[in-house]
Each structure stands twice: as C-alpha cells, then as structure tokens.
Curated annotation (Swiss-Prot):
The keyword Heme applies. This is Hemoglobin subunit alpha-A. CDD domains: Hb-alpha-like. Pfam families: Globin. Heme b binds at residues 59, 88. Heterotetramer of two alpha-A chains and two beta chains. Residues 2-142 form the Globin domain. PROSITE patterns: GLOBIN (PS01033). Belongs to the globin family. Signal peptide: none annotated. The lineage of its organism: Eukaryota, Metazoa, Chordata, Craniata, Vertebrata.
Length: 142
C-alpha cells in the first residue's frame, strides 16, 4: 500500500501527539497486547508483565521509538527498520502476525488518548502506515 502525501501528513499529525508520550503509550500498548492476545507473552519470559512494570515501560518506549524512526523516515520505512527486521527475524524469531496485533493495540491507545484526531481518514492513514511498518519488519523472514 502506497502512502499518499495526505497519509503521511495524517501520520505526522498523530505522531505529534504521541511522540511526547512514548513510555506511557508504549507500555499501555504492550499491556493491551498481553491481555488481549496472551500468547504474545511467550516472547517475554524474563519480563515482569504486571501493570506499570519497569520492564514493560522500557520496552514500550523502545517499540514506540522505533515507530518514531519509521515516522521520521516515512519515505524509506524498510531502510529505517532494517536492523530491527534482522533482529526480529533472525534472532528473536517473532511470529510476524504479532506485529499486526501490536498495531491494533496501538490504534486503540491512540484513539483512547486522542479521540478527536482519530477521524476515519486519519485511522485509514495510520492503518496504512502501520501495515507498511509490519511489512518492513517481516521483510527479512524469507
């Protein structure tokens, strides 16, 4: 899916709200992921997965920082996330479906905190962007 200029502008608008809340929104996204899709916990056997865990907060910040890199390099998402794709495909061996599940949880978090900006048009743009991120992250699985 190609991101239009309008999609890119919409994603950057969302990120202008999210970017200053990386740890908060990131940990909330992960907590939702673990609750709604409990099988995703298997990738974090060494983490304290309780609410407000320092490990979940730190990893949430990492996850959203990576999304921020994708936003900052929106015209070259695969290039921006290449090393992360290698890590997840070759070392961590994360099932690619989990990126889609994480994306769903992230959209819920954005909508919960910023309901007025998540219009149908912005939602579509964000979905397209997150799909491009998931595609980039799974590109090294072959």
């Amino acid at each position: 899916m190609v991101l239009t200029a309008g999609d890119k502008a919409n994603v950057k608008t969302v990120w202008s709200k999210v970017g200053s809340h990386l740890e908060e929104y990131g940990s909330e996204t992960l907590e939702r992921l673990f609750i709604v899709y409990p099988s995703t916990k298997t990738y974090f056997p060494h983490f304290d997965l309780h609410h407000d865990s320092a490990q979940v907060r730190a990893h949430g910040r990492k996850v959203l920082s990576a999304l921020g890199e994708a936003v900052n390099h929106i015209d070259d998402i695969p290039g921006a996330l290449s090393k992360l794709s290698d890590l997840h495909a070759q070392t961590l061996r994360v099932d690619p479906v989990n990126f889609k599940l994480l994306n769903l949880c992230f959209v819920v978090v954005v909508g919960r905190h910023h309901p007025t900006i998540l219009t149908p048009e912005v939602h579509v743009s964000l979905d397209k962007f997150l799909s491009a991120v998931a595609t980039a992250l799974t590109s090294k699985y072959r």
